[in-house]
Amino acid sequence: MVKALLVGSKVLIPNVDESRYIYSNGFYGKAIGISKPKDPKDIIRPLELSLIESVYLAKKGLIKVIDKNGEVLEYEKLYEYSSKIINKFDIMYRVYEDLREKGFIVRSGVKYGADFAVYTLGPGLEHAPYVVIAVDIDEEITPHELLSFGRVSHSTRKRLVLALVDRKSESVRYIMFKWVKM
């Protein structure tokens, strides 16, 4: 199991060989100082994981997260910690996990005004075809919010997907928007 260190809202894998291993198993994390490596061999620095990625990898048994006191944070504790740091973590994590289990590569979508950028092949190999916004199925979305989501996805030439999470059934439904000129 790969050793990872919790540092605030990030998790670091200091060992470069272990970083390469984790990255090569699904494009997890970002190598510090290297943008969009095309090959795992390009990983020559420690890997930085988001909390969402870390919770997922801990659940899968691929990483062991250790806090500043040397305590190992198992999946449940790491999930609880992340919930305190990230707004709507439960909704975001449910969507992240669902997309990963469906075989997609899921990265942060913050620069696109979304929760996630989703790839079919991987970063550095293609541009992300989708941006995903995670929403509680019971949450109301105003027409103005919907239009603002659409503007960002349209200007970046990505398909907008709303991921609707039903907390009761823990299911996720997806709605993809296609914008047309009239």
UniProtKB/Swiss-Prot annotation:
It holds the Pfam family tRNA_int_endo_N. It catalyses: pretRNA = a 3'-half-tRNA molecule with a 5'-OH end + a 5'-half-tRNA molecule with a 2',3'-cyclic phosphate end + an intron with a 2',3'-cyclic phosphate and a 5'-hydroxyl terminus. Signal peptide: none annotated. One of its GO terms (biological process) is tRNA splicing, via endonucleolytic cleavage and ligation. InterPro entries: tRNA_endonuc-like_dom_sf, tRNA_intron_Endo_cat-like_sf, tRNA_intron_Endonuc_cat-like, tRNA_intron_Endonuc_N, tRNA_intron_Endonuc_N_sf, tRNA_splic, tRNA_splic_arch_short. The active site is at Y119, H127, K158. Keywords: Lyase, tRNA processing. Its EC number is 4.6.1.16. It comes from the Archaea. Gene3D superfamilies: 3.40.1350.10, tRNA intron endonuclease, N-terminal domain. It is an enzyme of class 4 (lyase). CDD domains: tRNA-intron_lyase_C. One of its GO terms (cellular component) is cytoplasm. The keyword Disulfide bond does not apply. GO terms for molecular function: lyase activity; nucleic acid binding; tRNA-intron endonuclease activity. Belongs to the tRNA-intron endonuclease family. Archaeal short subfamily. Endonuclease that removes tRNA introns. Cleaves pre-tRNA at the 5'- and 3'-splice sites to release the intron. The products are an intron and two tRNA half-molecules bearing 2',3' cyclic phosphate and 5'-OH termini. Recognizes a pseudosymmetric substrate in which 2 bulged loops of 3 bases are separated by a stem of 4 bp. Homotetramer; although the tetramer contains four active sites, only two participate in the cleavage. Therefore, it should be considered as a dimer of dimers. This is tRNA-splicing endonuclease. It comes from Saccharolobus islandicus (strain L.S.2.15 / Lassen #1). The gene is endA.
